[in-house]
Structure formats: structure tokens, C-alpha cells
């Protein structure tokens, strides 16, 4: 199940309730980590242009901006991308492209920080008073 979730490019995996309360939860998490690490080695992450017909014009602009930034980072061999987001929407658009670069998402909102923490390839940071 873990391997298939990685192959389907899930943003996150987690233990089921039975496993989370069982006697071997630490071992289960370690096994999930190992399976995920191995499975990710066989994936190729590109920048597919996902469906944009159901989003606003402003969000389309954000999506295109993120796509351009990811392609530019790839062309220039840039390892880290910084983005600033109040709602997490920009980070969600970035995660949808399954980036191969580390994306640091800065926010002043604790709920946004928690939300972006489970997104694929996003490393969230809290900026108090922003």
C-alpha cells in the first residue's frame, strides 16, 4: 500500500488507526519511511500541466508563475525555491507539479504552516508578525 501510494505521487502517507495504536508503531513508521525512500528512487518527477479550467484567472496566473519558477530552477540548477503564502494556495500549486527542488514556503499563519507541512516537496516556515 505504501509503495503504491508513492507511485501515485501521494502528498503524504500515514498509519491506519489499527497500526497507530498497535504495539509496533515505531517499527511501522520506520518501515513506511524505508519503503517510501526506495519507491521515490524509481519515480521521475516532472512538471505536468494539471487541469486549470476550474480555477480563477488569478489562480491561473499563480500556477503559471510557479511552473515557470520550477522550470527556471531546473534550467539553472537551483536547489532551493522560496515562496511566501498567506493561505497556502501558492504552495499547493507548487506541490501539484511534484517539484524535484526543495521549496521553502514562508507564512505568518500557523494554520497555513500546518496545511503546507503535508504537501509534497514543501518545507514550511513560520514568519511571526508577517
Residue ranges of each PLM-predicted region?
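Flexible, glycine/charged-enriched surface loops at secondary-structure junctions
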Residues: 16-17, 22, 41-51, 79
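Terminal amphipathic helices with adjacent charged low-complexity linkers/tails
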Residues: 22-23, 29-30, 107-109, 113
Amino acid at each position: 500500500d505504501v509503495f503504491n501510494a508513492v507511485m501515485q505521487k501521494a502528498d503524504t502517507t500515514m498509519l491506519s488507526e489499527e497500526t497507530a495504536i498497535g504495539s509496533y508503531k515505531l517499527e511501522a513508521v520506520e518501515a513506511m519511511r524505508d519503503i517510501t525512500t526506495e519507491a521515490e528512487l524509481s519515480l521521475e518527477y516532472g512538471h505536468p500541466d494539471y487541469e486549470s479550467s476550474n480555477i480563477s484567472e488569478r489562480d491561473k496566473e499563480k500556477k503559471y508563475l510557479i511552473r515557470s519558477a520550477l522550470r527556471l530552477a531546473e534550467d539553472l540548477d537551483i536547489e532551493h525555491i522560496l515562496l511566501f503564502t498567506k493561505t497556502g494556495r501558492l504552495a499547493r500549486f507548487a506541490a501539484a507539479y511534484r517539484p524535484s527542488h526543495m521549496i521553502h514556503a514562508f507564512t505568518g499563519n500557523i494554520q497555513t504552516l500546518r496545511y503546507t507541512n503535508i504537501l509534497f516537496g514543501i518545507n514550511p516556515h513560520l514568519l511571526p508578525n508577517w
